[in-house]
UniProtKB/Swiss-Prot annotation:
This is Photosystem I reaction center subunit VIII. The keyword Plastid applies. The gene is psaI. It is a single-pass membrane protein. Its main location: plastid. PANTHER family: PHOTOSYSTEM I REACTION CENTER SUBUNIT VIII, PTHR35775. The lineage of its organism: Eukaryota, Viridiplantae, Streptophyta, Embryophyta, Tracheophyta. GO terms for biological process: photosynthesis. It is found in: Plastid, Chloroplast thylakoid membrane. The chain crosses the membrane at residues 6-28.
Length: 36
């Protein structure tokens, strides 16, 4: 794997991973506090 291919794989991974972690943490936070 060259340095040119690394960003093209890294950017979508971070772009999908960050919102996923944010939604999961928010979901568990709501479940724990019973805001719903």
């Amino acid at each position: 794997m060259t340095d040119l291919n690394l960003p093209s794989i890294f950017v979508p991974l971070v772009g999908l991973l960050f919102p996923a972690i944010a939604m999961v943490s928010l979901f568990f936070h709501v479940q724990k506090n019973k805001i719903v």
